[in-house]
């Protein structure tokens, strides 16, 4: 029997997770929810998803009916049929859903990176914490930036012990569909204090990095991708070739070369379009080969993170771990990647 997955919040993350679940042969989407009758709600129905109203209120149901969008009921009409819920709600709403819906109905749930690490049993990355999250009820898939950092640090740590990491994050201002968030013409410290929250978020996945990782971040007026500059000190001697080989062996990381035309995040997104990727998603972390350098025992590199899609395969693996569908994290990763057509 395929695992029954409910997507609560058919937005930027939710619609991608719904499509990714539909690509797997061991799970299925039993429903998706929306809070308002917008074009995304209409498209969900047109794609064949059963639509439910996220807010259990008859007046809210009537809004959908008046808009001509058929709904199957509210989330309370489907919640107990689900083996697991993937929460795609906006920041802070996920915790409310956890306390008000998921826990009272005793259904497993995955929250996203906008929620607090302390609000769940554990924090998920397929490479680092799959086994820890195995069979747990309430887990958070960490944010896009943290996911990218976890992947690259896994690659480096596979060949040398990490002594410390110093990372500068250049964050996109907003997603492409966000017409409210800025800045439009500024570079904004985010936060103005150092360190930023990204280091502790990595530690929530990899506790052994406590005291070893420090991050700072700024926001720039772009919508396409985040970019990271890493300076990682390791214990022992490694070469540039060692690092490049480790990166290429790590799943969900791809390398690109500026000399091949990948001169910016815009070119990476264009690559996704030319590949025919749905929504031009780049689920893989992208590392520039030319940026990789080693000075004594310190590694330098630059990487790009597609914030809308990097966490999607992680959600799929998290479903398998929590529902105890596959014990081996690498087998789950391989299965997910093959179904989604990613590396």
Curated annotation (Swiss-Prot):
Pathway: Carbohydrate degradation; glycolysis; pyruvate from D-glyceraldehyde 3-phosphate: step 1/5
Residues at which D-glyceraldehyde 3-phosphate binds: 143-145, 198-199
Swiss-Prot/TrEMBL catalytic activity: D-glyceraldehyde 3-phosphate + phosphate + NADP(+) = (2R)-3-phospho-glyceroyl phosphate + NADPH + H(+); D-glyceraldehyde 3-phosphate + phosphate + NAD(+) = (2R)-3-phospho-glyceroyl phosphate + NADH + H(+)
Binding site for NAD(+): 12-13, 114, 172, 307
Residues at the active site: 144
Record CDD domains: GAPDH_II_C (cd18127), GAPDH_II_N (cd02278)
InterPro entries: GlycerAld/Erythrose_P_DH, GlycerAld_3-P_DH_AS, GlycerAld_3-P_DH_cat, GlycerAld_3-P_DH_NAD(P)-bd, Glyceraldehyde-3-P_DH_2_arc, NAD(P)-bd_dom_sf
GO MF term set: glyceraldehyde-3-phosphate dehydrogenase (NAD+) (phosphorylating) activity; glyceraldehyde-3-phosphate dehydrogenase (NADP+) (phosphorylating) activity; NAD binding; NADP binding
Disulfide bonds: none
One term under GO cellular component: cytoplasm
GO biological process terms on file: glycolytic process
Stored Gene3D superfamilies: Dihydrodipicolinate Reductase, domain 2, NAD(P)-binding Rossmann-like Domain
Subcellular location: Cytoplasm
Keywords: Cytoplasm, Glycolysis, NAD, NADP, Oxidoreductase
Main location group: cytoplasm
Assigned protein family: Belongs to the glyceraldehyde-3-phosphate dehydrogenase family.
Subunit structure, as described in the record: Homotetramer.
Protein name as annotated: Glyceraldehyde-3-phosphate dehydrogenase
Organism: Methanocaldococcus jannaschii (strain ATCC 43067 / DSM 2661 / JAL-1 / JCM 10045 / NBRC 100440)
């Amino acid at each position: 029997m395929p695992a029954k997955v409910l997507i609560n919040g058919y937005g930027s993350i939710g619609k991608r997770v719904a499509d990714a679940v539909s690509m797997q042969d061991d799970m299925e989407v039993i429903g998706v929810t929306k809070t308002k009758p917008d074009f995304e709600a209409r498209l969900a129905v047109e794609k064949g998803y059963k639509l439910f109203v996220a807010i259990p209120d008859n007046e809210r149901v009537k809004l959908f009916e008046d808009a001509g969008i058929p709904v199957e009921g509210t989330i309370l009409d489907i919640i107990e049929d689900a083996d697991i819920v993937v929460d795609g709600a906006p920041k802070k709403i996920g915790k409310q859903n956890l306390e008000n819906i998921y826990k009272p109905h005793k259904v497993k749930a995955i929250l996203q990176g906008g929620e607090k690490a302390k609000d769940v049993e554990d924090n998920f990355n397929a490479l680092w914490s799959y086994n820890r999250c195995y069979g747990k009820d309430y887990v958070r898939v960490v944010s896009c930036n943290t996911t990218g950092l976890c992947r690259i640090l896994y690659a480096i740590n596979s060949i040398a012990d990490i002594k410390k990491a110093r990372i500068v994050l250049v964050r996109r201002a907003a997603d492409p569909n966000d017409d409210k968030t800025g800045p439009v013409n500024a570079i904004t410290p985010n936060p103005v204090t150092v360190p930023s929250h990204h280091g502790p978020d990595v530690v929530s996945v990899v506790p052994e990095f406590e005291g070893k990782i420090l991050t700072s971040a700024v926001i720039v007026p772009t919508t396409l991708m985040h970019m990271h500059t890493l300076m990682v000190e390791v214990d022992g001697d490694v070469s540039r070739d060692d690092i490049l080989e480790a990166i290429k062996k790590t799943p969900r990381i791809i390398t690109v070369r500026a000399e091949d035309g990948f001169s910016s995040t815009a070119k990476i997104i264009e690559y996704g379009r030319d590949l025919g990727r749905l929504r031009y998603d780049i689920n893989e972390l992208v590392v520039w080969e030319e940026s990789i350098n080693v000075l004594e025992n310190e590694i330098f590199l630059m990487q790009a993170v597609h914030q809308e899609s990097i966490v999607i395969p992680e959600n799929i693996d998290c479903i398998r771990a929590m529902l105890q569908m596959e014990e081996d994290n690498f087998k789950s990763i391989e299965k997910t990647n093959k179904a989604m057509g990613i590396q």
